[in-house]
A protein has these predicted regions:
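Flexible "stalk/tail and boundary" regions
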Residues: 1-8, 12, 22-79, 83, ...
């Protein structure tokens, strides 16, 4: 399970180090794709396959299905972790998430989110300001 928040730097070749405690969960490889809120989603391959299978089972006649499938699947790239525990983020994904130098890697149960540090801080401030409303809405869902 992925949890926690880690700060890393993007190197000149567009690589980031995966936090050590997460590397064992990514031994079979990973998939990175465009995420929501201008971040990147990084999934272990087995979790990615589950998501892709669910998307493939949805009706393509629905506009939201097509839009979400395009975002997630067309923007995706297979990744391998090198011997130093790094992954290469493709340039088009770095541009999408505005990732330049300082990167936040956030663990979210079955995936990692990769954020530009400034974007992460802005997002956190906005979310923390609404935390009571969010908690109430989740309570209505049984969380």
């Amino acid at each position: 399970m992925f949890i926690g928040e880690y700060q890393h730097n993007l190197d000149q070749k567009g690589r980031i180090a995966v936090p050590v405690k997460f590397r064992q969960l990514l031994t079979r490889g990973a998939v990175v794709t465009k995420g929501l809120d201008n971040c990147l989603f990084l999934y272990p391959k087995q979790e990615w396959q589950k998501l892709a299978d669910k998307l493939a089972a949805l009706p393509v006649s629905k506009a939201n299905t097509r839009a979400f499938s395009r975002l997630m699947l067309a923007g995706a790239m297979n990744l391998e972790i090198d011997k130093q525990g790094r992954v290469m983020l493709p340039e088009y994904l770095r541009k999408y998430a505005n990732v330049k130098k300082k990167v936040i890697i956030a663990g979210l149960y079955n995936r990692l989110e990769i954020w530009d540090e400034a974007g992460w801080e802005k997002y956190k401030k906005g979310t923390e300001a609404k935390s009571n409303d969010i908690a109430e809405a989740l309570g209505e869902l049984g969380v």
